[in-house]
Design a protein with these regions (language model features):
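Short, hydrophobic/aromatic alpha-helical segments in well-folded domains
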Residues: 143-144, 161
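Short, solvent-exposed positions on alpha-helices
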Residues: 156-157
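Conserved hydrophobic residue
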Residues: 152-153
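Polar/charged low-complexity regulatory segments
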Residues: 1-133, 139, 146, 166-248
């Protein structure tokens, strides 16, 4: 018995999953979640669902060694930081307004008695960063509404600050809406083949350090060995802008 060989124990572990949801209290944040439908003379803008879908596809593109996906991740990361700064500036302004409340008066937080709870299916860190920004905007909107209700700011200030915050988020989502997977790899550019030439003509030149892979987003995924033919997008379901954002 002591000489019998034992087979190693096989552990077939699946992927880790966590149930997540986002609770929104204001119609202003809810509209950002859903996006803006196209109208005559004004293009539509994806909502948070569409942004998450774009980030998931962008991450998969970067995994496939698409240098354009890496470049887009860097651009979105910079835009996320800019959006966060803009919302923080608005928060400081409304906090200053609320600071004028007399010490004898106590103001509680204004919470919606029927908030909307939205499920989240996010597979990219840049997607999570946008979720945090929308949650910040929802909290900011609640404080602005409270400040107006208690005569600390007038209606024009309320509307201007709400619009400034919404514009910052929609500008972020509008940028992400332009992303397209190029179907090329860095090997294509090293070989200077037809796929690389077509991508250059369609998407333009890339910064050299991005093309070489020496500069990537801090949330860029490891590059996987390519198993699909050039020009074939990463195998994953597309996500419609206003459909629930599911991921693999």
């Amino acid at each position: 018995m002591a000489n019998e060989r034992t087979e190693p124990l096989q552990l077939n572990l699946g992927s880790l999953r966590s149930a997540m949801s986002l609770t929104l209290h204001t119609h202003h944040a809810s509209r950002i979640w859903h996006g803006r439908a196209p109208t005559e003379g004004r293009p539509g803008i994806i909502g948070l669902n569409g942004f998450i879908g774009a980030m998931n596809k962008m991450k998969r593109g970067a995994e496939q060694d698409d240098p354009y996906s890496d470049w887009w991740m860097l651009r979105i990361e910079d835009k996320l930081a800019d959006t966060k700064t803009r919302l923080q500036t608005l928060r400081e302004q409304v906090d200053q307004a609320l600071a004028d409340v007399p010490a004898a008066l106590s103001l509680g937080e204004n919470m919606n008695v029927q908030p909307v709870k939205l499920p989240l299916f996010v597979n990219a860190q840049l997607g999570f960063m946008a979720v945090y920004l929308l949650a910040d905007y929802d909290d900011l909107a609640r404080k602005l509404i409270l400040a107006h209700h208690t005569a600390l700011i007038d209606r024009s200030t309320l509307e201007r600050w709400l619009n400034d915050g919404a514009h910052a988020l929609r500008s972020l989502f509008s940028l992400a809406q332009q992303y397209r997977y190029s179907g090329t790899t860095r090997d294509d550019f090293a070989a200077k083949n037809a796929a690389a030439r077509a991508a250059l003509e369609k998407f333009g030149e890339l910064p050299q350090d991005v093309l070489e892979g020496t500069r990537r987003s801090r949330f860029a995924p490891p590059i996987a060995r390519r198993t699909t033919k050039p020009g074939t997008p990463p195998a994953a379901p597309a996500i419609e802008p206003d459909a629930p954002a599911h991921t693999d």
